[in-house]
Design a protein with these regions (language model features):
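Acidic/histidine-rich helix-loop elements
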Residues: 38-50
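Extracellular beta-strand ligand-recognition surfaces/modules
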Residues: 1-14, 18
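Generic short beta-strand
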Residues: 1-3, 126-127, 226-227
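C-terminal beta-strand edge segments of enzyme domains
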Residues: 161, 208-209, 213, 220-288
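Active-site catalytic loop in hydrolytic enzyme cores
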Residues: 117-189, 204, 208, 212
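Beta-strand-turn-beta hairpins that frame and shape the catalytic cleft
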Residues: 24-33, 161-170, 193
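CN hydrolase (nitrilase-like) catalytic-core segments centered on the catalytic cysteine
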Residues: 90-110, 168, 174-246
Length: 288
């Protein structure tokens, strides 16, 4: 047992009673996560063809044993048409129904990105379906890429972490990744894994988000590689095209990158620190 106390002009430390208590070993929480790279290969604007493609993608990942399946961003965006006319009602739209039916068929958790129509507004959303095909979570992208603003898409107004039997799941979409606060707040909310559907992304930024917050990042992309990045920044699995499944043990407390913390690896921000020590920005301001 070590105590580091450094760089304080004045202060005291008292040691109280320290003891070791026997505890049961933490049971493994193994989860197979499936990610996907690439969209419909043809330039077809036939909605039926697109629906079938994504249903087949889920079938492929499920056949590899995936418990949690992630598809890319805006899978119902077909060609250069009007985004309002292509948007799905959630629940009830055709692409949503494919996600729901596939989740129920394979008894898997499925997350997919959709243009979502809610009354007079359109959002860039990600739907999380449970193994019964029910809507378990809905996240609306908060940081829009500038063309989306011109297309009339409305930003979401909050971040969420969803409780599942697999663990706590956070979601960020595409351009959200450019703001460190998004993944920081998801980690502070207890996320075991963050799902990152996108149309394209900067790999260096994605790796930094996993390292920054000591969490797993699952990536599915229309125009980039699919991968799962671990808290050290290494790829668990990766593919340039199609699907791949990675096995994660979410019972293991993620460790920071080995370079974090220097001689204070046992201190907050060091190797043994977890995302549970992170506070939302509001908390930091309140304490200032």
């Amino acid at each position: 047992m070590r105590l580091y106390y450094r760089w304080s002009a004045a202060g005291k430390v008292w040691w109280g009673y320290a003891a070791l208590t026997e505890a049961q070993a933490v049971a493994p929480r193994l989860v197979k996560v499936g990610v996907w790279a690439g969209g419909v290969p043809s330039k077809s604007t036939d909605r039926t063809e697109h629906l079938q493609f994504w249903e087949n993608a889920i079938d492929t990942l499920s056949a590899c044993g995936a418990d949690l399946i992630l598809l890319p961003e805006t899978i119902n965006l077909i060609g250069a048409g009007d985004v309002i006319s292509m948007a799905d009602v959630v629940p009830g739209g055709p692409f949503f129904d494919v996600l729901a039916a596939s989740a129920a068929k394979h008894h898997a958790w499925v997350c997919g990105g959709l243009l979502e129509r809610c009354r007079d507004l359109v959002y860039n959303s990600a739907c999380l379906l449970d193994p019964a095909g029910r809507l378990a979570g809905l996240y609306r992208k908060t940081h829009l890429y500038w063309p989306e603003v011109l297309q009339g898409i409305t930003p979401g107004n909050g971040l969420q972490v969803f409780d599942t039997r697999l663990g706590k799941v956070g979601v960020m979409i595409c351009y959200d990744s450019w703001w460190p606060e998004v993944s920081h707040l998801l980690a502070a909310g207890g996320a075991d894994i963050v799902l990152f559907p996108n149309a394209g992304y900067e790999p260096a930024i994605a790796t930094a988000r996993a390292i920054d917050n000591s969490l797993y990042l699952a990536i599915s992309s229309l125009y980039g590689p699919a991968s799962i990045i671990d808290p050290s920044g290494s790829s668990v699995v990766r593919t340039e095209k199609g699907g791949v499944v990675g096995l994660l043990d979410l019972s293991v407390k993620p460790q920071c990158h080995p370079n974090a913390g220097g001689s204070l690896n046992g201190a907050p921000g060091g190797r043994s620190a977890t995302r549970n020590s992170l506070l939302p920005a509001e908390s930091h301001r309140a304490e200032a």
